[in-house]
């Protein structure tokens, strides 16, 4: 099963695709979609959306996951990030994919083991878990981490559902 992780940003949106087979996770592809800061906000959002649509067509994931937005000190920046996140999430949603959302601390804990991990720790762990991943940027590493987090949580939810269905009340 292919899963897409997305790390939204207005300037750079990271994406990563993994293949999950049983309890094995493999790297498929990763990269970034960049928007041109000389363009209007609407045009930049369209660039991000179009880039993610292209990723969906190229790699055909069956589910997607995205990091939740944190609120920073600058309300205008937070608003723009939220708009970018919406444009990015819209692409898999319109393609009929489930789009899961995870807090940054949950993603870090799932991949590194601690919710307060630094970006370089996340990148190092991604390189360990996914040998051969090129990791164009930290944004791509974060996107792969989000996909891995979703794979872990999805597997846990599936195990719980199977246990309940089997009479494990």
UniProtKB/Swiss-Prot annotation:
GO molecular function: crossover junction DNA endonuclease activity; DNA binding; magnesium ion binding
Keywords on record: Cytoplasm, DNA damage, DNA recombination, DNA repair, DNA-binding, Endonuclease, Hydrolase, Magnesium, Metal-binding, Nuclease
Coiled coil (UniProt feature): none
Sites where the protein binds Mg(2+) 2: 67
GO biological process, one term: DNA repair
Cellular compartments per GO CC: cytoplasm; Holliday junction resolvase complex
EC number per UniProt: 3.1.21.10
HAMAP family attached to this UniProt entry: RuvC
Family the entry assigns: Belongs to the RuvC family.
Subunit structure: Homodimer which binds Holliday junction (HJ) DNA. The HJ becomes 2-fold symmetrical on binding to RuvC with unstacked arms; it has a different conformation from HJ DNA in complex with RuvA. In the full resolvosome a probable DNA-RuvA(4)-RuvB(12)-RuvC(2) complex forms which resolves the HJ.
Identification of the protein by name: Crossover junction endodeoxyribonuclease RuvC
Organism: Rhodospirillum rubrum (strain ATCC 11170 / ATH 1.1.1 / DSM 467 / LMG 4362 / NCIMB 8255 / S1)
